[in-house]
Amino acid sequence: MTALPAHLERVHMVGIGGAGMSGIARILLSRGGLVSGSDAKESRGVLALRARGAQVRIGHDADALDLLPGGPTVVVTTHAAIPKDNPELVEAARRGIPVILRPAVLASLMQGNRTFLVSGTHGKTSTTSMLVVALQHCGFDPSFAVGGELNEAGTNAHHGSGDVFVAEADESDGSLLQYDPNVIVVTNIEADHLDYFGSVEAYVKVFDDFVDKLRPGGLLIACLDDPGSADLAKRIVASGRSDIRVLGYGSADAQEVEAGTAFEPVDGVEVGVRLLGFHAHDVGGVLQFQLAGENAARTVRMAVPGRHMALNALAALLAARDAGAETEEIVEGLAGFGGVHRRFQFTGRERGVRVFDDYAHHPTEVRAVLGAAADLVRPEDDSSSTNSAAGRVIVVFQPHLYSRTAAFAVEFAQALDLADEVVVLDVYGAREEPMPGVSGALVAQSVTKPVHYQPDLSQAPKQVAALAHPGDIVITMGAGDVTMLGKQILDALRSAPHPAPR
């Protein structure tokens, strides 16, 4: 067992049930640390941590700092979700107990490992999870910390026996600059978290600064299909830094491969792998790709849908190869990847209607998920089939954060127009106070497809069941409690009268 730094031997975590915080707690417990924490409500994550020995209190008060014998050596929190006047943070300051952010703990836990960090505006959790599953299939036992629960492992974090540590690097508050990785994957870059950064330029710059943290001999893997990450790769190459490598991945067609141009450097950026095609199949898809230096394409059937997921898989492939894994075994591992909790997760099927759940809460994520859903009801290779003609995409969208809804209301509406029918719920405010004039109606009013604004969450399942017909796909979407509706929609479908033919 790897010894913990002295300051992490007794840790109190404010908001311990969150995806990122609970993962850190798991690793600390696995490495022999004592952990206490608090959270606003009971959850599956809290129950799992208690079962592993953590002392967790529901609600926040100063006495929570006495859950561990002798009190904590440090208090850990997150930048955005926990207010500064939280009584535990106030008490920690009174006692002189250091308060640090979650990324600082993760950086300490990574010391002595080869670190593989996945960053980008979207796709971090899925790509990180694919890399973990691929490495595990290849016989590695990596430590990992992921922002979602891997369906195969049933957990979001693990203390491994090997020297590889895989994690996603969250850019939302700039704290990813605390890491000094060996490998960085950047899936995409576009405006987000402007409430923190203040400008698009400042947001983009944090990725440049992050790449500057690469250790000598390190590797940047960047998606060339995305303008933001492609521009980052080109800037790094143009900067002349000679102690790191830059490797791109992205789409190409068969003609480019046959002409020998697919693997030519893009403004100096070396190309490692090309996606040649992706076709939807049931709840997954088949992707075709070719690696640089190989003369033939490879094909892999995946259990997760969407072209964006195919690109994520190629990023994971390049990273796993850099870790020393064999290509054939990596591909087998990716074929067995069953997805991540709340990332286009299959909830169930009732009366011919497939129900999925997704965490998408940014317009680009919404577009990617709805595009993948459209492929499932209207497959590229069977666009004339009866099934394809009948199937529709119905999205139940819950906007996340008042500030994000106000900033991107029109963009959300444009993305939601990729669905055939839209149900918009009210805003899930999370840490934010309501803003005048900002509600789900602000998004719904700009949707041009058939749209229903439903401010009452409890009424949504019956409403959706009445809209859905056999062959349709329903997606519950958002970063809030919309995820609870999936099972309720299936129940409503089960008990609803048989729908009349369209």
UniProtKB/Swiss-Prot annotation:
GO MF entries: ATP binding; UDP-N-acetylmuramate-L-alanine ligase activity
InterPro entries assigned: Mur-like_cat_sf (IPR036565), Mur_ligase_C (IPR004101), Mur_ligase_C_dom_sf (IPR036615), Mur_ligase_cen (IPR013221), Mur_ligase_N (IPR000713), MurCDEF_pg_biosynth (IPR050061), UDP-N-AcMur_Ala_ligase_MurC (IPR005758)
Function text: Cell wall formation.
A Pfam match: Mur_ligase_M
Keywords tagged on the record: ATP-binding, Cell cycle, Cell division, Cell shape, Cell wall biogenesis/degradation, Cytoplasm, Ligase, Nucleotide-binding, Peptidoglycan synthesis
Its EC number(s): 6.3.2.8
Binding positions (ATP): G120, T121, H122, G123, K124, T125, S126
NCBIfam families named in the record: murC
Pathway connected to this protein: Cell wall biogenesis; peptidoglycan biosynthesis
Biological process, per Gene Ontology: cell division; cell wall organization; peptidoglycan biosynthetic process; regulation of cell shape
A Gene Ontology cellular-component term: cytoplasm
Record's subcellular location: Cytoplasm
Similarity comment text for this entry: Belongs to the MurCDEF family.
SUPFAM superfamilies named among the record's database cross-references: MurCD N-terminal domain, MurD-like peptide ligases, catalytic domain, MurD-like peptide ligases, peptide-binding domain
Organism: Rhodococcus erythropolis (strain PR4 / NBRC 100887)
UniProt protein name: UDP-N-acetylmuramate--L-alanine ligase
Reaction equations catalysed: UDP-N-acetyl-alpha-D-muramate + L-alanine + ATP = UDP-N-acetyl-alpha-D-muramoyl-L-alanine + ADP + phosphate + H(+)
